[in-house]
């Protein structure tokens, strides 16, 4: 019997698999595939009464964040997202699917926004005597290739898609947190805020710790005493 099932969302948020750095080393990451499976499994397990998602992540894939948030929203058992050092960008998106969000007064929360920034290597390549040969079947096929300059048309195309993703992110946070869209837009400048400011703006529900998460479940009638298992 496991009254509360704990699930970790640590490091980069990915849709599946692990992330690698430029040297091929593994980066701490958590996949939506693993988290969604764990949430669904805990929700179906008769020995589990509540679900705790412990978050310490500064983001990653927006799709992954949306998938995790959706899994939390459709879970029939009470859910809490507990933010440790931070829940930013896609990780915060994931947390908004929980019934209740708790964070430390000094947790980083939010970073509602989208980025597509990258390094342009064209000048470095020129200095190294390298020439980029452009071969493609459509003028936008290699948009974002760091070895060629970004044209004005390509920049506009990329910005269009970033704006679409940003708007969807804002809408989902507003819906999940019960906030007005205009309120979320004011907060959606890509910055994080500390716990108290997050609480004041409705991004979280309480300042606290794992003990407060357990007390929430007790108050909801889901459990009678603190007992936590981990996937």
Each PLM stretch: what is its role?
Residues 1-78, 86-176, 226-231:
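Small-residue-centered hinge/linker elements
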Residues 26, 112, 189, 204-205:
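Short N-terminal micro-motifs specific to bacterial/archaeal maturation
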Residues 52, 81, 134, 183, ...:
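A generic structural-conservation signal
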Residues 82-88, 187-191:
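Glycine-rich beta-to-alpha transition loops that act as phosphate-gripper elements at the mouths
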Residues 137-139, 178-191:
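Short catalytic/ligand-gating loop segments at beta-alpha or beta-beta junctions
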């Amino acid at each position: 019997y496991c009254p509360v099932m704990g699930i970790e969302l640590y490091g980069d948020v990915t849709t599946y698999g692990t992330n690698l750095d430029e040297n091929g080393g593994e980066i701490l990451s958590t996949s939506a595939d693993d988290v969604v499976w764990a949430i669904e499994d805990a929700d179906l397990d008769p020995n589990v009464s509540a679900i705790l998602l412990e978050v310490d992540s500064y983001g990653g894939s927006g799709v992954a964040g949306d998938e995790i948030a959706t899994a939390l929203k459709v879970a029939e058992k009470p859910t809490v997202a507990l933010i440790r050092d931070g829940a930013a960008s896609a990780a915060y998106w994931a947390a908004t699917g929980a019934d209740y969000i708790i964070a430390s007064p000094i947790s980083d929360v939010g970073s509602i926004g989208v980025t597509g920034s990258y390094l342009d290597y064209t000048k470095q390549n020129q200095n190294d005597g390298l020439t980029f040969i452009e071969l493609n079947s459509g003028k936008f096929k290699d948009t974002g290739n760091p070895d060629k300059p970004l044209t004005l048309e390509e920049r506009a195309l990329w910005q269009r898609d970033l704006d679409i993703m940003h708007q969807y992110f804002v809408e989902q946070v507003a819906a999940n947190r019960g906030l007005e869209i205009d309120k979320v837009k004011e907060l959606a400048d890509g910055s994080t805020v500390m716990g108290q400011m997050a609480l004041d703006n409705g991004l979280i529900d309480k300042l606290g710790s794992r003990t407060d998460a357990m007390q929430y479940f007790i108050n909801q009638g889901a459990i009678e005493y603190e007992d936590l298992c981990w996937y």
